[in-house]
């Protein structure tokens, strides 16, 4: 514990919070253009072909974003909406593509958690 004299000489340092999604520049989402759409494999205990896209954002950053849900219609030059949120088993993937916004279609035949995948309510 410092003395009052020590605090007068040198004040306490503020803890600077580091953003987990710096490419969004403090915005909730950002628009971007897909430069490459491909699949990649996850880290050690898991095994799959995860769908990801390299996206050039309006903020100037080029980021790797995860495409959630079953099936997608994205290709190069698709305009997408990107939100934050990392994928734990894919190193370097710190963003998600929002389904059902801009050029991204919602997930077809989705009945639960529909709002997360841009799916409309099914007809009775």
UniProtKB/Swiss-Prot annotation:
The keyword Transferase does not apply. Transmembrane segments: none annotated. The keyword Acyltransferase does not apply. The modification 3-methylthioaspartic acid is found at residue 89. GO terms for cellular component: small ribosomal subunit. One of its GO terms (biological process) is translation. Keywords: Methylation, Ribonucleoprotein, Ribosomal protein, RNA-binding, rRNA-binding, tRNA-binding. It holds the Pfam family Ribosom_S12_S23. Belongs to the universal ribosomal protein uS12 family. With S4 and S5 plays an important role in translational accuracy. Interacts with and stabilizes bases of the 16S rRNA that are involved in tRNA selection in the A site and with the mRNA backbone. Located at the interface of the 30S and 50S subunits, it traverses the body of the 30S subunit contacting proteins on the other side and probably holding the rRNA structure together. The combined cluster of proteins S8, S12 and S17 appears to hold together the shoulder and platform of the 30S subunit. This is Small ribosomal subunit protein uS12. The gene is rpsL.
